[in-house]
Amino acid sequence: MRYLKSLAVAATVSLSLPVTASAQQALTYKDQEKLHDIAAAVQADRIEKDIQKLVSFGTRHTLSETESDTRGIGAARRWIYEEFKRISADCGGCLEVMYVTDIIEGETRIPDATEVKSVIAIQRGKTDPGRYVLMSGDIDSRVSDVMDYTSDAPGANDNASGVAGTLEAARVLSQYEFDGSVVYAALAGEEQGLFGGKILAEKAKEQNWRIHAVLNNDMIGNIEGINGVINNTTARIFAEGTRMDESDREATMRRFYGGEVDSPSRNVARYIDLMADRYIPNLDTMIVYRLDRFGRGGHHRPFNDLGYPGVRIMETNENYYRQHQDLRTENGIEYGDTIDGVDFDYAAKLTALNAVSLAGMAWAPEPPQNVDIEGAVQPSTTLKWDAASQGEDVAGYKIYWRLTSEPQWQWSRFVGDVTEYTLENIVIDNYIFGVASVSEDGFESPVVFPGPAGEFSIDFEEEGDQ
């Protein structure tokens, strides 16, 4: 009798399994050989040479010399400009190289009128040039006194490493053509108040750039932490939660529908984390649920402030003896951001991560817009979204979902070229959902969480109505 009862229980369990198992489909992703090629093309020796050149300018302080050809931020930015020009010449003029500039004055760290002049290079997309992904590093450097613009400030890791990585990404990616545009930016004025980023973000807003990801690289070369940890196999991705430009109405919606951990920036971070797992050997990325390091800032923030998705990519282990320090030795400790503190292979690894992430997003279609979700007091969940713009290379869409307590997507389903789909017997209350666009070649956009909390597109014309 006990045996028969066991059979009955087993039969009941087996009958219930197909409903659950069929609903929960493991994550699927098409491996892209071109992204493996891009990762392999990044060269540490070129990054080393670029860092050496940037260090050779003595100081790159925002208030430093601008007329000398050998010292100061003026010489540094002119060299970066010419380097972008050389890269463009190697790809048949595929880069539009320009300065982005404004006069800043009356600020705590820029009291007198100063031209804050950044250098950018734009690789225009072939089918959707108005859609952008952006990689940045910071030109300027500093010592202990943020207003000291004459002392040597090599800034080898902070942040010649980020600029060198951006130049190297441009060398590699300029050998390919993408659907969307890629921007490579060397930004000035970071240490004095994030002014280079503010100027470029405002330019993007004025010109209606559809920026879907800003990858700010600020210190990507240090592997020896001040805590004694030495590790070249991990990196951090900082990503804000709730968008800075969220309206009161949107905040109320988020309270009832969720989305505080699924901002566009967080889903860009998840995208980059997936790229690390698939294409960068021996690198594990840590997504940090914070705008930046505790109480600190970086050049992705001005873009976040306007509503653009943006993250900071950087080393895991910082060494504060090598940040914002006068060059000196005290009590046997060597202070200063010198080139001997940079691991060039590690910087190349993080540069490759940027390159494959930029390429994957630029080859993918635009992220879905106006994603909506329904399913309250229902056994199933329905998602809806707008069809991609005409001319987009779209094979269809993929729905992702995960338990509400999980940081990463757990399940996915390609649903074809439709704008509405119902996940049968998946209860809306128990999961977080999102939708990605998929190209004919299998490249995917970042995942979009339903509603305003997860929306990638920005309509600046509606700002006054918020």
Where are these regions (language model features)?
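Active-site-adjacent mobile loop/cap segments within catalytic or ligand-binding domains
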Residues: 55, 220-241, 287-363
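Metal-dependent peptidase/peptidase-like ectodomains
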Residues: 187-298, 306, 310
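Alpha-helical metal-binding/catalytic segments enriched in His/Glu/Asp
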Residues: 121, 135, 140-141, 145-194, ...
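Conserved aromatic anchor
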Residues: 379-393
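A non-catalytic alpha/beta surface segment that caps or lines the substrate-entry region
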Residues: 38, 46-124
